[in-house]
Structures are given as structure tokens and as C-alpha cells.
Amino acid sequence: TRLTCNGVGIDIVYKRLLVNEYLPIMEEQPDLLNAYRAGAICMVNSFRGKLVHKKAIFAVLTNERYRYLFNDAELEAIAKHIPWTRVFRDEQTENKGEAIDLVEWTRANSHKLVLKPNDDYGGNGIFIGWNSTPAEWDAAIAAALADGDYLVQERVKTAKELFPMLTDKEGHWEMVEQLVDLDPLLFLGEV
């Protein structure tokens, strides 16, 4: 199944289309998926990359019940680099070795938590506990539970660096402190 556009064959596709954007049109527009399944194209940012796009991977990495999956070096790296995260639902879990009721603990610890959708980007749907009133945080908790696909995550210090920024149309610029947000890409196992 060769993928073409206006009669020109396509061998490589850099996919920017999100899976949740493709699902509603997949039946009417199957050519991309068919070519991918047939191995007729090389797809950069393939559908298999969706796993790391899902933020719930952090809940697996930081949950005590999955510690047995990792060796000591991996556990050390996880503890150092991955914020404590849980799929947000009405359940018992642990935080720093202490048994907690996740919903009530989340309600009581808004000062250090965020609620975020598992499958979104660009800050969409995020509730920031430390910027919320108690009533807003209660509403966020209710919305996240009703949605069913939210995470609760502990606040981490966000890195800041100086970056050049244009200040006018004449090309003047200045160094401005900005948050650092890296989106590393992997290709054949290399960053």
C-alpha cells in the first residue's frame, strides 16, 4: 500500500498528527495508517511513540507496587528525575512510604500538587493547586474524577535559563529568563 499525494510517492512521514486527533477521522482517512501497517513508509514520531506521550507512564515509574520492575540504578534515576505521580482515582496508595487515601490527600495538599489530563499537551486542562482557592481545588478534583483520565503529580522546581528575545521590529533583543521545556526525540535508541 503505497502512500501518495497528487501522484507523488511518499517514503517518509514526520507525523505531527496526534492519535486523539486521528481517531475521529481514521475510518474516512485510512491511507496513513494502512501505509504504516504495511511498512510502506518510514514514520518519524510513529504511533508507537504514543506510550511516552501518555503522562500515566510517570505513575507506573513512581508507584511502589511496580518497584520490582526496576533495578537499583533505575530506581535511583526515577527518584532523582521523575515527580511522584498517580492516576487520579478514588483509591488507597502511598506517598513517601505513607498509606494515603488519594482523593482526600490530594484535597489536603493542593499547595504542592497539580491535576493534569493524561493525554493532552500545551497546558490544556491543568489545575494548579497552589494557584487555586479551596473551592476551585474542590471543583478541579470533582472534574478530574468525573473525566476519569487525570493524574495528580507533585510540584517540581522548573528549570529557568536566559534566552534571547526580540523586543521590537527593529531587531533589538535582550536576555530574558524563561522556563526550560525539553521535548527530547529518540531515533534508533539515541537521544
Residue ranges and their predicted role:
Residues 1-191:
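Domain-scale recognition of functional cores that engage charged ligands
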